[in-house]
């Protein structure tokens, strides 16, 4: 409630926060590492100058999520690769809920979220939270938004449990993603079934 009041009461246009986690990438049989970006980002970001192009008062920095306890629990209790992958995917649902709540608060206050870190699994709760928040604020008639993904991968794989490779599919299937555009999509990185689904939508 205190964070929500701070966001609503701020004159800032943008709200910055971090999601230093890599559980979605690991749940997609990928290599972790997206959890390490937040601190180096801050070291550079805090050295930016406030000027006519970007006034520091336009940005409210509220901190970052800490999902280290989920990572530790999985690392210390999962037995074997299959159980570990399933646990990562289950943990992504928890991350989704927390990120969606925060983004909904930010957008309902008519502000723009700026997010650093995490995998593309975070695209789903960002889209969902933004659509709900902007709809609540009266900015959009339906809780649906359009999205441009600048990536070599479409991240539109089947709904087989949440991970970094299917965020946009979940967002569309759940009705929060209206139009989806991928810029930089690499032919060698898209399964045929995902390609057909994107072309037909």
Summary of predicted features, one role per range:
Residues 1-201:
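Conserved alpha-helical scaffold segments that buttress catalytic/binding sites
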């Amino acid at each position: 409630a205190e964070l929500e009041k701070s966001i609503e009461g701020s004159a800032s246009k943008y709200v910055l926060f971090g999601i230093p986690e890599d559980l979605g990438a690991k749940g997609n049989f990928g290599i972790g590492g997206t959890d390490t970006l937040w601190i180096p980002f801050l070291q550079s970001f805090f050295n930016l100058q406030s000027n006519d192009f970007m006034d520091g008062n336009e940005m409210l920095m509220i901190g970052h999520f800490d999902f280290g306890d989920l990572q530790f629990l999985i690392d210390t209790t999962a037995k074997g690769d299959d159980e570990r992958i399933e646990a990562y995917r289950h943990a992504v649902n928890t991350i989704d809920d927390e990120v969606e709540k925060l983004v909904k608060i930010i957008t309902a206050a008519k502000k723009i979220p700026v997010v650093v870190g995490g995998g593309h699994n975070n695209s789903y709760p960002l889209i969902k939270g933004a659509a709900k928040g902007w709809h609540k604020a009266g900015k959009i008639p339906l809780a649906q938004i359009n999205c441009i993904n600048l990536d070599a991968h479409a991240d539109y794989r089947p709904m087989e449990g949440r991970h970094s490779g299917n965020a946009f599919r979940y967002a569309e299937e759940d009705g929060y993603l209206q139009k989806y555009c991928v810029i930089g999509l690499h032919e060698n990185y898209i399964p045929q079934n995902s390609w057909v689904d994107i072309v037909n939508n």
